[in-house]
C-alpha cells in the first residue's frame, strides 16, 4: 500500500481505512505499524468503529499536537487510555462509546 504524504482525517470501519474522506484502503486490521503511520500525520480527526483498539495501540497518539476530534467506538479501551488524551492539547471532542472496560476511574487524567 502506498501511503499518501499527508492526511488530516482518518476513519476506519469494516476493514476500510478512509483518509481525508476520499482515499480508501482495504485494511482488515489496525496493526501497531499502521497506527504509527497514522499517528505520524498531522491529523485533526481520527475515528475507528468496531475494531478492538487497545490502550497499547492508542499509545502512539500520545502528545499528538493537532488532534481535535478522536473517537473509538466498540473498541477494547480501558480507563488507562485517558493519559493519552490528556496529552493532546487541541482535543475538543472525544467519543468512546461501547468500550465496555471504561468505567470512569481514569477520567481525572483529563482535568487540567
Regions found by a protein language model. Give the residues of each.
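Concave beta-strand-loop units of leucine-rich repeat
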Residues: 4-112
Amino acid at each position: 500500500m502506498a501511503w499518501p504524504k499527508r492526511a488530516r482525517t482518518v476513519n476506519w470501519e469494516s476493514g476500510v481505512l478512509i483518509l481525508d474522506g476520499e482515499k480508501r484502503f482495504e485494511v482488515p486490521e489496525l496493526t501497531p505499524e499502521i497506527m504509527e503511520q497514522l499517528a505520524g500525520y498531522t491529523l485533526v480527526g481520527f475515528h475507528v468503529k468496531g475494531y478492538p483498539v487497545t490502550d497499547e495501540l492508542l499509545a502512539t497518539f500520545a502528545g499528538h499536537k493537532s488532534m481535535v476530534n478522536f473517537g473509538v467506538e466498540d473498541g477494547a479501551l480501558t480507563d488507562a487510555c485517558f493519559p493519552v488524551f490528556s496529552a493532546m492539547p487541541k482535543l475538543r471532542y472525544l467519543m468512546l462509546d461501547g468500550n465496555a472496560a471504561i468505567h470512569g476511574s481514569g477520567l481525572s487524567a483529563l482535568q487540567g
